[in-house]
Amino acid sequence: MKSNSMITKAACLMLMASATTSAFAQKMNIEHKGDTTIIKVENPTKYLLLPIQEEKDEAQVLLDTGSKDDTWMDVRLAQNGSDYYVPFALGKGKTATVKILGLKKDALALNLLKLSDTFDTTNTDYYRPSYHFTPLYGWMNDPNGMVYKDGEYHLYFQYNPYGSKWGNMHWGHAVSKDLVHWEHLEPAIARDPVGHIFSGSSVVDKKNTAGFGKNAIIAIYTNNSSVNHDEVQCIAYSNDNGRTFTKYEGNPVLTPFDGLKDFRDPKVFWYEKGKCWYMIVSADKET
């Protein structure tokens, strides 16, 4: 009887596990409305893996959460061949809705989409630098906002997480204790509806002069409009040692004046004698 009881309990547990798995199984539905492809994922995984074909034109991809901060990303989705995948975060919730503009209904990408909670970043490129810093995947350029705090060197950099060409400018992020060995972190500041997050600098506000908190890390960066490429200076602040940033609600803090163009790349530093912050911004002016 004891043996039969154990078998019965085991069978019940297996059925419960099966029911739980079934209840939370992922389901992806794709539909087309005009020039928009709508992908709905029930019980979404962490990522939707997007197949990339570098030679093709960019489509626009959006995670639609209904927020004013939802941002279209430019992605070279696979048309008739695939070079590699990039992860597209689906966020949390029972359903994730992804919208795509500029993708043909018969594009190969729609047959190659994958759902996954992980993304393999194993370095398989023989010629990839092992000493010089490179991101786990994607495109990088200028180092930005380099700062030292609490035993860590912070390296932020121009970063496109959706391909190996320029675009979708974010601030990527890595930290190191010795400037040689780097820990890769999630992008710190993402492209937003205003535009791309261009280069800038960071400071540790030891005296809380800005009011964001003592020892907050404050990033000062150029926001480049996705529409007309106007450039303005914005700030964001972090109270968790640079892992995440909150964009200042009063952005922009500085706009072009006196006919200035190419108004970007702010460098900020504290002038102790004057007890104030100074900002140096590169600019061009036609005369």
Regions flagged by a language model, labelled:
Residues 1-27:
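Bacterial Sec-dependent N-terminal signal peptides
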Residues 26-265, 270-287:
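Beta-rich carbohydrate-recognition and catalytic domains
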